[in-house]
Structure formats: C-alpha cells, structure tokens
C-alpha cells in the first residue's frame, strides 16, 4: 500500500481509557470485557480504572483476562488514553463531570452521553481546549446507525427493569 492511500487500520499503540463512572448511582460501564477483546484484536490497547466494571457486575479479573490493563489512579487513565469512554460525561454529569474536565487535554477524544444542550458551557470549554467530543445520544436514529443507538437500547433495558422490579 502506498503512503498516499488511507488505511482502515488504527494507528499503532492507540489507547482507549475507561474511568469509573462518577454520576450518582450509575451502574453501567462504558466497555464490557467482551468488547475489550474486540478492541485488542483490532490493535487498540485498553486501560480501565480498577473497579470501573464492578457496579455493572464485571470483575477486574474479567477485564484483565480480556487483555485490558487495570489502573488504580483515575488521573492516569486520562493521561495515558487518547480516547476516553464514559457512560455519562461532561454535561450529562453536572455534579461530578467537571472533575474530569481539567483532566482532558488537547487532541483527546471523549465518547459518551454528554448532554451537549444542557451542558453547552462544558462542551464549549472542551472544544476550545481542542477536545473532540462524541455525544452518543445525538447519533441519528436511522437503520444504518441502529447498532449505536444508545437511547433506544437503554430505554428498552430500563423498561424491562421497571416491569421486573
């Protein structure tokens, strides 16, 4: 392949980081151990904060077995990772999300539910610092993007939980 031809392969040593969720009573985690293996196979390294999966029922050893590196220090997740995955981040976490704002740096990418309308000031601040944000709740609800539709999938799960509770 020539140097002018774009590659679909991720750059070598790309690191995805998953810090523990800080939104009150949030039990979800942004990445399950099964997905760690998929990312590893694609050449992406995964680091996860120790205990991040516990509220969702995933033990640290499951992440380690899938190939993730466990890190105790939350700040180190933000220092080492190019891409940060969180369930509720930025404006979607008004009480604690600002704690992470100072940890994000220029060139970093933040993926999660960001609530960019209610948290517009937070989002503008991140953009001004050169942080790229993907607000998953704004993905179009079309057939082609259905596998990434976080609103429908999470609403369905919440509905089942309400019936069973």
Regions found by a protein language model. Name each.
Residues 82, 88-89, 114-115:
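Short glycine-/small-residue-rich Rossmann-like dinucleotide-binding loops
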